């Protein structure tokens, strides 16, 4: 990943997390920015571009979706679905965690066939989160 691409991915990551998680203080995301920036280049990341600019991305660690983010100006245009559909073409199973209060994301993944497998409290934020899973034959 080029440095400019990483800058764009990180801008989307920060903006999207702050926007989607109003129930978590912005400082949590800002304090984790450098750590995420360090691990993204070693992760499996697929991007969606519009006119040569990255507008969304999905990051994987094996079959685990570490994140699916779309720039705010490009949300509700099917970009997240396209990124997820692409990953589904070569991953037979997928899983991810989503905060219970992130209703929009929860509904999106439910529409895409994910089911709740477990729930736990995120020890870093104190927020309830769900483990969602998807099997290729579901």
Question: Language-model segments: which ranges?
Answer:
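Conserved beta-hairpin
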Residues: 44-56
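A short, internal acetyl-CoA/4′-phosphopantetheine-binding micro-motif in the GNAT/acyltransferase core
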Residues: 64-75, 98-99
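Conserved acetyl-CoA-binding loop-helix of GNAT-fold acetyltransferases
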Residues: 70, 76-89, 107-111
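A short beta-loop-alpha structural element at the N-terminal edge
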Residues: 1-11
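Conserved beta-strand-loop-alpha-helix junction that forms the acyl-donor binding cleft
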Residues: 96-107, 122-128
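Active-site rim helix/loop that mediates acceptor-substrate recognition in acyltransferases
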Residues: 23-45
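Conserved GNAT acetyl-CoA-binding A-motif
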Residues: 84, 89-101
